[in-house]
Amino acid sequence: ANAEIARKIIDHAGLSDRIHVVLGTLGNGGQTLDHLESVCGLSAGGLDFIFIDHAKDAYLPDLRLILEKGWLHPGSIVVADNIRVPGAPEYRAYMKKQEGKLWRSKEHKTFAEYQSIIPDIVLESYYLNN
C-alpha cells in the first residue's frame, strides 16, 4: 500500500521517469540488487541520494552492499533516520570511524516519530571516497 501511494505522489510530481519505487531488501540474496541494475539501470556512480529508513540492524549491511556495487560517487548523500530511537548503533559507529576518510557526517537532532518528547537523530552523510 505504501509503495502504491509513493508511486502516485511521484507521478503527480512528474518525476516517474527519475524515481523508481522498489519493493524488497538489499540483503535478499541479490534479487533486489539485480533488479536495481537490470530493470532500473543502476550502475557505478549512479546514486546521488539515499534515504535509509527500514530495519535498523540492516542500515550498515545495506550501505556496505551499495558501496561494494560502486553505486555512490563523491558527493552522494546518505540520510539515515531513527539513528538514536530505536537506534542503529553499528551504523552510527561506522560513520564516526570513517569521518573525514570515506564520509563527512552531521547529526541533526530531532524527535522520534509520533513522540515529540523523545529525542532522536537523523544522520546526514556526504560520500568522500578518499
Describe each region flagged by the PLM.
Residues 18-20, 46-48, 74-77, 103:
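Residue-level recognition of the N-termini of beta-strands and the immediately preceding loop/turn
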Residues 2-46, 57:
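S-adenosyl-L-methionine
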Residues 56-130:
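C-terminal substrate-binding/active-site "lid" region of AdoMet-derived donor-dependent transferases
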Residues 50-53:
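Hydrophobic beta-strand segment of the Class I
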